């Protein structure tokens, strides 16, 4: 939880340092959509970044990159490149589309939408829903991984050998159990957060 709060604080700092900022909720059309609030609900189109920070976040906005940090996060818009999300519960809705990679760190992650490249997830629980479409791989560090029998995962599913896994035999994908290097069963969130920190520094 401390690591998640640290990443959330960095998101907020970056938002404060960028000049084109919108402190409100509603529909927007701008180079960047950037919102800090307790409750965030956005629609519209950004020609650049979508950066949202709050307690409860609902993003139906479209943009090039998504940077989202909150407690409850729901994404139903279209991200044309990569999405970086930190939260307690993160849901990619059925209408949500990530056209490149999804990086997510949360206690619970639910994917019902489309990811057109890879998913990098660090979470206590990951659910790939019945409407999910993942064109690339799933790289997971999680205690529990569930893939619905009607989900589409075209790449490789990678998880720790200690993970509690439910993957239907009919799923057309490769499944790889990665050997655990340490002896703890704690979820390691360092890898995904490292990716988030790296992008923010750049």
Feature roles, as predicted:
Residues 1-202:
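Intrinsically disordered, low-complexity terminal regions
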């Amino acid at each position: 939880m401390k690591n998640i709060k640290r990443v959330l604080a960095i998101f907020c700092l970056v938002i404060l340092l960028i000049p084109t900022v919108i402190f409100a909720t509603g529909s927007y059309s701008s180079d960047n959509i950037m919102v800090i609030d307790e409750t965030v609900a956005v629609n519209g189109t950004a020609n650049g970044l979508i950066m949202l920070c709050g307690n409860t976040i609902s993003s139906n906005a479209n943009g090039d990159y998504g940077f989202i940090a909150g407690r409850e996060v729901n994404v139903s818009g279209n991200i044309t490149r990569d999405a970086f999300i930190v939260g307690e519960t993160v849901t990619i809705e059925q209408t949500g589309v990530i056209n490149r990679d999804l990086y997510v760190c949360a206690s619970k992650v639910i994917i019902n939408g489309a990811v057109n490249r890879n998913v990098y997830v660090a979470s206590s629980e990951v659910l790939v829903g019945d409407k999910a479409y993942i064109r690339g791989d799933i790289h997971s560090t999680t205690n529990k991984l569930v893939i619905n029998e009607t989900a589409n995962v075209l790449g490789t599913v990678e998880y720790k050998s200690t993970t509690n896994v439910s993957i239907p035999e009919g799923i057309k994908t490769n499944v790889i159990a990665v050997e655990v290097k340490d002896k703890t069963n704690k979820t390691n969130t360092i890898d995904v957060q490292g990716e988030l920190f790296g992008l923010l520094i750049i």
